[in-house]
Amino acid sequence: MAKRDYYEVLGVDKNASENDIKKAYRKAAMKYHPDKFANATDAEKKDAEEKFKEINEAYQVLSDNEKKQQYDQFGHAAFEQGGAGFGGGFNAGGFDFGDIFGDNIFGGGGGFGGFEGFSGFGGSSRRSYVEPGNDLRYNLEITLEEAAKGVEKTIKYKRTGKCEHCHGTGAEDDKMKTCPTCNGQGTIKTQQRTILGVMQSQSVCPDCHGTGKVPEKKCKHCRGTGTAKETVEKKINVPAGIDDGQKLKYAGLGEASQSGGPNGDLYIVIRIKPHDIFIRQGDNLYCEVPISYSTAVLGGEVEVPTLNGKKTVKVPEGTESGKLLKVSGEGIKSLKGYGKGDIIVKFTIETPKKLTDKQKELLQKFEESLNDKNYEQKTSFMKRLKKIFKDIID
């Protein structure tokens, strides 16, 4: 069955603001929230579950600027396996409903709380609430030359890692006991009366962080958190062709989890230093090259810069200021692995200054030797100007 358009699912158009999308999501999610179907038939529960999943899938994409741009460009194909988006399709894990509904809209502190994987319409009451550690972001500054050719960099960053003394358990001698707060369930349930009726929600136990276990005796080194601050050194391979603002993901190099889950990820954000000569647009490089008046008139050869040194190019006779010349294949290597961009040279004619009397005299004689045929644009402009004045007088 084909997926519905995400904008249609939330009932908004493509130009809807972030706030409008959030309001539409809240309204739709409240309508199909599982607690409202507690006494419904199995068929109604199943239908509501599918709609609720669809609503949250749509919101997870449209509320994220990067994913929204991918969806607008590629549609659902952006998020299919191997597509241009986030690869594995929609996953509710780690999605913070509390950001939309607030901590108390459906009861106790976590919004939809334990509605993990959208299995809240039934099933086992004992689930795994192990959460991954936090992701980290690192800004890596490189030169344009390094971006063009690729480079290996070594970075150092601080993160919250596992405590070496308790191996991340938080317990002295690794001895654990059943969490008394949640009785080993990993979650706590809360009920609250709202205008929609009594709402029940589940949230991760704040004491055991969803594991159902707590230390018999807390580790004296980490005080029971199972984590410790550490400095990590990592070699980063920056591929040739990468652009400013693009990210490199290193799975598992983020912060440690407090609930025994996997580490978060490390995202390297590339920042390219401004260049003295070139401006980059995609895989092409743009630069301005000044030429003399005589070279512009008579033509000739000039040296233009590239990332691999200088290259001699021909300047056509009669070149005007602002004329563009393409130097093929001297731009940035495509990140996709094939082809290179170009260098686009913009010629600017430099007007000579501080002329001697003799030079001025020669230039004046040269100017007097010219006629309308030598100035096509000027002649054309004067004809049009003359016609305008004639029409006004008539």
Swiss-Prot record:
Binding site for Zn(2+) 2: C179, C182, C205, C208
Biological process annotations from GO: chaperone cofactor-dependent protein refolding; DNA replication; protein refolding; response to heat
Cofactor: Zn(2+)
Gene Ontology CC terms, in alphabetical order: cytoplasm
Family to which the UniProt record says this protein belongs: Belongs to the DnaJ family.
Domain notes: The J domain is necessary and sufficient to stimulate DnaK ATPase activity. Zinc center 1 plays an important role in the autonomous, DnaK-independent chaperone activity of DnaJ. Zinc center 2 is essential for interaction with DnaK and for DnaJ activity.
Reported function: Participates actively in the response to hyperosmotic and heat shock by preventing the aggregation of stress-denatured proteins and by disaggregating proteins, also in an autonomous, DnaK-independent fashion. Unfolded proteins bind initially to DnaJ; upon interaction with the DnaJ-bound protein, DnaK hydrolyzes its bound ATP, resulting in the formation of a stable complex. GrpE releases ADP from DnaK; ATP binding to DnaK triggers the release of the substrate protein, thus completing the reaction cycle.
PANTHER family cross-referenced by the UniProt entry: CHAPERONE PROTEIN DNAJ, DNAJ HOMOLOG 1, MITOCHONDRIAL-RELATED
Protein name in the entry: Chaperone protein DnaJ
Gene: dnaJ
